[in-house]
């Protein structure tokens, strides 16, 4: 059902945690995968090597998505290397868990530049290729705080809420070319970068989920693969919650 043979995918933040799971799932479905990273070079190269060892096609691409010119250069390189682009997964993000009164303008700009402008940059650079594909897919990954809010995540939630609006608008604007745009809103996914905080608060955190566990990258990747495939061709402008029942909006 999720046959992606002959398609090219770009996954931002594709070398670690949820992004790594998405990169692997798209490759398993047959896509050639451009694995973007900002500073996590070793992790990205490991994911690429795993895909290649399994017989897939993948290549790492360094770019700070907050830098429009860097994104344009990355997308141009993907086109040169793979011949085009069919699938864009906006997965990279930046979250600073702080009380709003303790945040600084620098904190605001860092999170908005990555979470909102980063998605805008990638979509703008990729849009001509996605529309030319005739089956373009844009899938943006975010926390469910973007829909329901969360204490300590005000700025990141606001930035990601803007990305939801971006996806809905692009779904309307680009749909005539066969391009879809959707958001996936996540509950807390266990990952290496916040392992200490999760371990310290696990018992409290897990009680917020009707399904008494936190999420895994493997809970997310299959939905991305479905949306990227022909099976997702009539799903657009939607916000799909993968949150273990944390929110039921």
PLM segments and residue spans:
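Catalytic loop of short-chain dehydrogenase/reductase
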Residues: 97, 139-162, 167-176, 188
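Substrate-binding pocket helix/loop in short-chain dehydrogenase/reductase
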Residues: 99-100, 104-112, 194, 205
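Alpha-helical segment proximal to the catalytic Tyr-Lys
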Residues: 128, 172-173, 233
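A glycine/serine/threonine-rich, flexible loop-to-helix segment
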Residues: 172, 176, 183-209
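Short, small/polar-rich loop/turn modules that mediate ligand/substrate recognition or access, typified
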Residues: 135, 175, 180, 235-237
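Conserved glycine-rich cofactor-binding loop
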Residues: 8, 15-17
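Short C-terminal tail/terminal secondary-structure segment
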Residues: 3, 148, 204-208, 225, ...
């Amino acid at each position: 059902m999720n046959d992606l043979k002959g398609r090219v995918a770009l996954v931002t933040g594709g070398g670690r945690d949820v992004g790594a799971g998405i990169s692997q799932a798209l490759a398993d479905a047959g896509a050639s995968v451009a694995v973007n990273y900002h500073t996590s070079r070793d992790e990205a190269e490991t994911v690429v090597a795993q895909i290649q060892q399994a017989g897939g096609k993948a290549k790492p691409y360094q770019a700070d998505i907050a830098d429009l010119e860097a994104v344009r250069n990355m997308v141009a390189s993907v086109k040169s290397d793979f011949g085009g682009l069919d699938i864009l997964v906006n997965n990279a993000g930046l979250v600073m868990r702080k009380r709003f009164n303790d945040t600084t303008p620098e904190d605001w700009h860092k999170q908005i530049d990555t979470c909102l402008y980063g998605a805008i940059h990638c979509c703008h650079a990729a849009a001509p290729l996605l529309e030319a594909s005739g089956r373009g897919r844009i899938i943006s990954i975010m926390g469910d705080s973007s829909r329901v809010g969360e204490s300590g995540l005000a700025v990141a939630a606001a930035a990601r809420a803007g990305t939801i609006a971006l996806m809905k608008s692009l779904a309307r604007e680009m749909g005539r070319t066969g391009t879809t745009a959707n958001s996936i809103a996540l509950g807390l996914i266990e990952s290496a970068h916040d392992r200490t905080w999760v371990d310290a608060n696990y018992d409290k955190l897990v009680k917020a989920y009707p399904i008494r566990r936190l999420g895994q990258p493997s809970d997310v990747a299959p939905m991305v693969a479905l949306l990227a495939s022909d099976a997702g061709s009539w799903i657009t402008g939607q916000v799909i919650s993968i949150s273990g029942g944390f929110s039921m909006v």
